[in-house]
UniProtKB/Swiss-Prot annotation:
Catalytic activity entry: sn-glycerol 3-phosphate + O2 = dihydroxyacetone phosphate + H2O2
Keyword Cell cycle: no
Pathway assigned to this chain's UniProt record: Membrane lipid metabolism; glycerophospholipid metabolism
Family, as annotated: Belongs to the FAD-dependent glycerol-3-phosphate dehydrogenase family.
Binding site for FAD: 21-49
GO MF annotation, one: glycerol-3-phosphate oxidase activity
Name of the protein in question: Alpha-glycerophosphate oxidase
GO biological process, one term: glycerol metabolic process
Gene Ontology, cellular component aspect: cytoplasm
Tagged with keyword Transmembrane helix: no
Signal peptide: none
């Protein structure tokens, strides 16, 4: 069965006569992760997403699968241990998506510096031990000031004392979501985008037994019934819970906005991802990451109460990031006009004073005494003179000394929670993209327990080894496997660059992609084939779905976007049979998204439509 708009109507009709085991609200990474595991276990599963899959938070991250070294700023050892373990699992189950990309960490001797050269080496050694890369080619190492500047000549030299290099992974966040979605759909789940939940249904005993849905394409409403309903809507979690009049649990979300800006690689040349203090003594850090022929940087971390579906980049966001990056790279002199693209996303944070921070924050700093106690414990642990509980005890004692004052946006917990209301609504919230599988595993175990109470019995899969769509590759030899797939594409007539692009984008699905080889007017064969496959197998419903989330044209391929978008619109018009009015509406939406991304309004101009 294909996965396209042509199957969507039939799927919706099927929901009217089906009682599902599990109904998932939300088609970001959390909901997709739950759906993979429930469908694989044989649970009758339906997922409803009000926008495109991954359109909310899950396509707007920093696009890294973090190992979490930032958590060692407060020596949150347990968080780092969990994070690097999950990162390794994600690399196993989706080997064509996360790619190793060692991170440079320049160290400056200035007020509020996160690390000194000594403390960063201790942190990186502990990080490597937890990530199980000690002794490998990805083992961390220190650089002198001169070595750092030899790598990145544009970096600020003043107060630079050296740097460290440690293992991190780049990620294609939206592709990770769609590959999970496709796996669940292949295993029998009904996956429906542009389907907004507008009401919660209850049985005669007041227990949740379904939802009312509004089709965003037709405005028609329908009901879907299920034994278990789980809310996985990220920042929207409290909003969905408000639809349930019987939900007595207090609100738990405190979304913060993160902004990233994209410039041409020639404007900001960095050979590898770089992570540094802002230099503002505000406890925050900023990433600068090369991608395609571009460089992006971020992020901000500010409380957000606006339109969750359309967070925007403000002048204040731009000024903050440009000030920091231009000070760290003084010869770059990036201006607003240099920004080619941008994105703003919401983090689904749970308000919790005890949480580990993400991007720094002025509160909760360890005292020098506490810091030194932890360092000594870690040194002994790395020398195999102490056991891990000794380190954990030192960390716990230090954390207990940290004053629980007003919570800074950057200190709200990235931890997750799973709660069940009195009438049965499950809500899985919080977490990080790296943790999505682990979060889903905990939720699915609870779902299975609830279904067992009603007499159902399911055997859960081992989700640590269950591959996403496209991920059926040997993770230990992924580059060799992708090279072999690229050879197949070359045999099919694609040049080397196009073949490599398709292999890395689609992984083990490439042979199926090649079955969709075609040539649309205005597009080359590579783009035509990718679009044709996405229309049939990836539930692409609009040009924005394809150009922003199934591919990265809008963010990182601006040089060719104008040439590509007309051909994409024309091909989709033929595929869907759009009228001139429908085509014009899609073109308008596409141009609005592009204008928002390239900050046309802030630049004071208008794009031609």
């Amino acid at each position: 069965m294909t996965f396209s708009q042509k199957d969507r109507k039939e799927t919706i009709q099927e929901t009217a006569k089906t009682t599902y085991d599990v109904l998932i609200i939300g088609g970001g990474i959390t909901g997709a992760g739950v759906a993979v595991q429930t469908a694989a276990a044989g649970m009758k599963t339906v997922l409803l997403e009000m926008q495109d899959f991954a359109e909310g938070t899950s396509s707007r991250s920093t696009k890294l699968v973090h190992g979490g070294i930032r958590y060692l700023k407060t020596f949150d050892v347990e968080v780092v241990a969990d994070t690097v373990r999950e990162r390794a699992i994600v690399q196993q189950i989706a080997p064509h998506i996360p790619k190793p990309d060692p991170m440079l960490l320049p160290i400056y001797d200035e007020p509020g510096a996160t690390f000194s050269l000594f403390s960063v080496k201790v942190a990186m050694d502990l990080y490597d031990r937890l990530a199980n890369v000690t002794g490998s080619k990805y083992e961390n190492y220190l650089l002198t000031k001169e070595e750092v500047l030899a790598r990145e000549p544009q970096l600020q030299a003043e107060n630079l004392v050296g740097g460290g290099v440690y293992l991190d992974f780049r990620n294609n966040d939206a592709r990770l979501v769609i590959e999970n979605i496709k796996r669940a759909q292949a295993d029998g789940a009904a996956m429906i985008s542009k389907a907004k939940v507008v009401g919660i249904l209850h049985d005669e005993q007041g227990i949740i037994n379904g939802v009312e849905v509004e089709d965003q394409l037709t405005n028609e409403r329908f009901e879907v019934h299920a034994k278990v309903v789980i809310n996985t809507t990220g920042p929207w979690s409290d909003i969905v819970r408000q639809l349930d009049k019987n939900d007595e649990l207090p609100p738990q979300m405190r979304p913060t906005k993160g902004v990233h800006l994209v410039v041409d690689r020639e404007k900001l040349k960095v050979p590898q991802p770089t992570y540094f203090d802002t230099g503002k003594n505000d406890g925050r850090m900023v990433f600068v990451v090369p991608r395609e022929n571009k460089t992006y940087f971020g992020t901000t971390d500010t409380d957000y109460t606006g339109d969750f579906a359309h967070p925007t980049v403000t002048q204040e966001d731009v000024d903050y990031l440009l000030t920091i990056v231009n000070e760290r790279f003084p010869h770059a002199q990036i201006t607003l006009d240099d920004i080619e693209a941008s994105w703003a996303g919401l983090r689904p944070l749970i308000t919790n004073n005890g949480g580990s921070d993400y991007n720094g924050g002025g509160k909760g700093k360890l005292s020098d005494e506490s810091f030194e106690q932890i360092v000594e414990s870690v040194k002994e642990y790395l020398a195999d003179e102490r056991q891990r509980p000794v380190v954990e005890k030192a960390v716990k004692q230090a954390q207990e000394r940290v004053e629980a004052s007003k919570v800074d946006p950057s200190q709200v917990s990235r931890g997750s929670s799973l709660e069940r209301s009195k009438d049965g609504l499950l809500t899985l919230a919080g977490g990080k993209i790296t943790d999505y599988r682990l979060m889903a595993e905990g939720a699915v175990k609870r779902i299975n327990e609830l279904l067992q109470e009603s007499g159902a019995s399911f055997e859960l899969v081992d989700s640590t080894t269950y591959p996403v769509s496209g991920g059926e590759l040997d993770a230990a030899n992924v580059e060799e496997e992708l090279a072999k797939l690229a050879d197949q594409a070359q045999t099919a007539g694609f040049n080397e660059a196009a073949a490599t692009y398709l292999a890395h984008l689609y992984g083990s699905n490439l042979p199926q992609v090649l079955n969709y080889k075609t040539k649309f007017e205005g597009l080359d064969e590579k783009e035509s084939t990718a679009l044709n496959y996405s229309l049939h197998e990836e539930m692409v419903l609009t040009p924005v779905d394809y150009l922003l989330r199934r591919t990265n044209h809008i963010l990182f391929m601006r040089d060719t976007l104008d040439d590509v978008k007309a051909g994409v619109v024309a091909a989709m018009t033929d595929f869907f049979g759009w009228s001139e009015e429908e085509k014009a509406a899609h073109v308008l939406e596409l141009n609005q998204v592009i204008a928002e991304s390239d900050l046309t309004a802030l630049k004071g101009g208008k794009k031609d439509e």
